[in-house]
Amino acid sequence: MNTIGFIGLGLIGGSIAKAIRKYHPDYHILAYNRSKEALASALSSGIIDGVCEEMKDPRFGTCDYVFLCAPVEINLECLAYLKEIRQDGCIITDVGSVKGIIHQKVEELGMTDCFIGGHPMAGSEKTGFDHSNERILENAYYILTPGGEVGLEYI
């Protein structure tokens, strides 16, 4: 069984989680979000299976994939923690529009073998989990910027 982690469950993170739940209902989804209401909604609606009370939750170390869907400063902070706890083969990705600073941090941390930067070209004028939609990424470009050592089988 694949385990997917989300740090940030707003419009984009929530939309990706909803799509994963729809197309891969057997996957185990964990999430952290600043808004406890969003987590409660995601849990009660069956989108996620587990709530992480903090972004540095050790359960993220059990994930096969971790989506960083928070503001870039928080994503940068999470990278160092994830480096210490991630299991072999875990792929970490982000959904931010800024790539230079996050790839610089990935290189500094020696994580070029497990990081795939991502930028979904989708969104809405609305924000938050309540406005997320499993179809928001349909027919949208999703630009990937993998680290230099990521195996092609992960892309």
Predicted regions mapped to residue ranges:
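A structural micro-motif
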Residues: Y27, D49, C90, D113-C114, ...
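Short beta->alpha hinge that forms the Motif I/post-I loop of the SAM-binding pocket
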Residues: R34-S35, A70, V95
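NAD(P)+-binding Rossmann beta1-loop-alpha1 motif at the extreme N-terminus of oxidoreductases
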Residues: M1-E54, F60, Y65
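Rossmann-fold dinucleotide-binding core
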Residues: L109-I155
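Hydrophobic/aromatic beta-strand patches that form the interior of the parallel beta-sheet core
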Residues: L30-Y32, C52, T93, I116, ...
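Glycine/small-residue-rich loop that forms an oxyanion/phosphate-binding "nest" at active or ligand-binding sites
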Residues: Y81-S124, D130
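Rossmann-like NAD(P)-binding element
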Residues: K56-R86, C90-I91
